[in-house]
């Protein structure tokens, strides 16, 4: 189901003392187990109705594929997003003073998906990724700490001083590699979108899909179906404008906007 203002306003809430140890001073809002889906219209409009202050936002066990845009909220310290279907982890959308983030059981399989977490707020101290296939990969812990060197706890285990020191050293090299990888992904994604607009590529059939080009490993059947339908209905004039925007796109954000346009906001 989509987010609605009513669902947010009527969400159960209670007070806890998880972070500061002071009795019942932190408000936790519960929006879990509702099958909530993210979009660019209903979700942000509905979350504008989220009570202030809210210190803990529980969105566990929904159908979100990207982070809700909470970058303007400096009151939310804990964000619980376990058991969703997260594929796009844009850290720029996270609350500005976030301390704890749970992404457990989201089917995250590769480090590329987690690269945007390198831009997490510097306040993030606690990250949970347990239950994701990536946890079983070689050097998992070391690589995550290099991405987010501010962490003090990873998967409920304290980060040692030795780990923290190594993470700080690795961070510079990791960021350099990320920059180059992003450049290559940007080019592949731009080509894939342009091919789709030109009718030379139908996702999921005879060439590499946009999903593969962007290194997203989860199936996106609904997105593929809608994109093919939307592109098929575009006029030549509209296609020309989109081609021009693609040619001038210089950031992943611009490409994501164009992708959402072609998928009807799915």
UniProtKB/Swiss-Prot annotation:
Subunit record text: Associated with the spliceosome.
Chain coiled-coil ranges: none
Protein keywords: Leucine-rich repeat, mRNA processing, mRNA splicing, Nucleus, Repeat, Spliceosome
LRRCT domain residues: 132-170
Residue stretches of each LRR repeat: 30-51, 53-74, 75-95, 97-118
Classification via Pfam families: LRR_9 (PF14580)
Domain of life of the native organism: Eukaryota
Gene Ontology cellular component terms for the protein in this record: Prp19 complex; U2 snRNP; U2-type prespliceosome
Family: Belongs to the U2 small nuclear ribonucleoprotein A family.
Gene Ontology biological-process annotations: mRNA splicing, via spliceosome
Described purpose of this protein according to its UniProt entry: Involved in pre-mRNA splicing.
Gene Ontology MF term list: U2 snRNA binding
Iron listed as a keyword: no
Protein known as: U2 small nuclear ribonucleoprotein A'
